[in-house]
A protein has these predicted regions:
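Membrane-anchoring hydrophobic helices of lipid-metabolizing enzymes
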Residues: 1-71, 81-83, 92
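Catalytic core of membrane glycerolipid acyltransferases/transacylases, capturing the structured
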Residues: 24, 68-125
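Short, flexible loop segments at the rims of nucleotide/cofactor-binding pockets, characterized by
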Residues: 32, 45-51, 74, 122-127, ...
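Hydrophobic/aromatic ligand-binding patch that stacks against planar heteroaromatic rings
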Residues: 87, 138, 173-174
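Active-site glycine-rich loop that binds ribose-phosphate moieties when present
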Residues: 122-132, 164-169
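A structural motif
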Residues: 139-153
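A cross-family acyltransferase "interaction/gating" segment
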Residues: 145, 158-202
Length: 202
């Protein structure tokens, strides 16, 4: 939020309080622990930290071999990916995600499970699209399965409700091109009260 960069005395007092509430130091400690881990180990570590009690149905729709494309809503952000990974990887350890390429810049080892996507329109180029499609082609030829969040963004808060943003057609196009079944996943979840409070303030 731009107001956090203000030099006002009140803001300078608020920042350390926010850092304490949000567990900033703990987060930095977690980052230090995971930044050198292999992709799958890293995901396991984060899943243990962030995933609480969950109820899962529809396991029978997960094939043990052959490519599938799982399309999913995106209510909570990173936690969505962790839940999906912890669920699917038990049966499909070859799973990969179409996700923000910035992740692979920060954590290069995540290239093992991330097809890099440039979500920012002003940075999206023919080269970046080819990079994404080349990753997908290689993965699907190896019969790997993919996860796509077709909205490309976190669900939008509208009052007290979450509204999924419009979906891009990328998943349908890939499924058609490679003759791969599409499997829908629906996550019923919300972020914390603090998350929505800060979203409102922002």
């Amino acid at each position: 939020a731009p107001w956090l960069n203000s030099n006002k005395v009140g803001i300078k007092i608020i920042i350390p309080i926010l850092a304490f509430i949000l567990g900033y130091k703990k987060t930095l400690g977690t980052i230090d622990q995971i930044k050198v881990l292999p992709a799958n180990t890293l995901m396991e570590k984060l899943a243990k930290v962030f995933i609480g009690k969950i109820k899962i149905t529809g396991h029978s729709n997960i094939q043990s071999n052959g490519s599938q494309i799982f399309v999913c809503n995106h209510p909570t952000g990173i936690a969505d990916g962790l839940v999906i990974w912890s669920t699917l990887s038990k049966k499909r350890p070859d799973i990969f995600f179409f996700a923000n390429k910035d992740v692979t810049h920060l954590l290069p080892q995540m290239q093992d499970i991330i097809a890099p996507v440039e979500w920012k329109n002003n940075k999206r180029t023919l080269r970046s699209k080819k990079e994404t499609l080349a990753y997908a082609k290689k993965a699907f030829e190896a019969k790997r399965s993919a996860v796509i969040f077709p909205s490309g963004r976190l669900a939008q808060r509208t009052g007290l409700k979450l509204k999924e943003r419009p979906w891009f057609t990328s998943a349908v196009k890939l499924a058609s091109k490679y003759d791969i079944p599409l499997i829908p996943i629906n996550i019923k979840a919300r972020n914390s009260f603090l998350f929505y409070l800060f979203d409102f303030i922002h």
